Amino acid sequence: MKYEYIILGGGVAGLYTAYHILQKSPNSSILILEKENHLGGRIHTFSGKHMIVEAGAGRFHEKNILLFELLKELGLDSKIDKISGSASFAPIENPGVFMNSILDREDVGSLDFLRSGMGFSPSVDFLTPIYKLFFDMALGKQNIPNAELIFRVIIASKGEPLTKLQNISFLQFAKEVLTKEEIDFIAGSFGYYSELVIMNAADAIYLMEQHLTPMNQFYVLKGGLSQIIEKLESKLVKHKHIKILTNRAVKQIHFSKNEFTIHCENLETTYIGENCICAAPTGVLQKFRIFHPVKYLLNKIDCQPLCRIYSQFPKGDDGAVWFTGLPKLTTNNDLRMVIPIDEKEGIIMSSYTDNKFARKWNQLFEKEGEPGINRRLISLLKETTGRDIPLPVKSYVFYWDCGVGYWSVGANSAMVSERLLHPMKEMKLFICGETYSYQNQQWIEGALETSKKLIDILSL
């Protein structure tokens, strides 16, 4: 059988694309091939004996318009739940001392005056007393220094050519503004690492201003984000011309005589389609010969690992868990971020890491298993909080080798994103996913946005 559309990837980008194709053209024949034994990709709500937690994507914010629209369409909008964006920095040099962070606060007012509205590009020297006063008013004297340091870098960037910022990392650019000690402090206290060293400065600054800004309200979905996947799947399978196959790892894509032939590993069966839509990360696409002409564009996106470690802790003699009252933390050891989830059930995200820190945890887990993870967690949590830490009842490690994509140094993200959507005009080959989003990379919104653009190209 020849399908009108073959979609490679059963994550949210692939399912959302199929959903919109069928909305506009209900009789279209569609085949979705997913390499795992389940749909969802990096949206995965883990449900086990000890906890129900987000193994992959976790939160979204008020600017994620397409996601809000989708949640309403799927009848999930009543489950949207506000979460506090506030966080504190816990330096290991002073265990138990927590410093506030403006970058995660919601109630500090607008910072737009720092970006626009002045009618000119203000100098760092001019703005320093203004935003220093602003930070003191918002946070008092215990504000975390990295907020001021990061904003000094952002302000300094406003007078720089875009091409310069695209060709250096955030920390490389920061060297022109800050001292080595200040840069080291940012690297230690800013929870995310890849944004500082992997992303080009232009896109990293955009991410900080638009997605990590304290003005955004953040949310989670009660019951888990996997409900989005389940709802989309249930709507898709109602159409008689769609087929969804899991455990189908694509080995090769061939194009000849205006049609695509898809070969899967360990299967003699091939699949034929008129349109091929690839909703998979760059690392997958780079293996296919058909994408070699645009490999130089795919190389502009650097996929880096993420690792979430959740633990359930026992209650003490007083009936409370050790992390009672603990705020969300960033810290300058291998934990990087610590996020309490449910004090009543004793659930905490004991570590959330990216880049080299995520790899280190995964290597430890592969070598020493859960006991090794627990030993390391107890040591680092005590180092960070100054509290006595009991042995966890259970810990789960969720490691993603390609957690999210980053626009790398040298990338013109606007151009590359546009080019990769329909990379070779002579064939009906398309790409979508958060990885390829110009302005919403690293968010579910990016998957939906690139899918929407693809649908527009198809002109259904």
What do the PLM-derived regions correspond to, one by one?
Residues 135-249, 256, 289:
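Active-site/ligand-binding neighborhood in enzyme catalytic cores
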Residues 94-104, 251, 256-260, 264, ...:
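Charged, often glycine-rich, active-site loop that binds/positions anionic groups
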Residues 16, 24, 259, 331-460:
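Conserved flavin/dinucleotide-binding core of flavoenzymes
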Residues 51-140:
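Dinucleotide-binding Rossmann-like beta1-alpha1 core, especially the glycine-rich loop
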Residues 22-48:
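Glycine-rich FAD pyrophosphate-binding loop
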Residues 254-255, 262-321:
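Central helical "cap/lid" subdomain
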Residues 3-32:
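N-terminal Rossmann-like FAD-binding beta1-loop-alpha1 element of flavoenzymes
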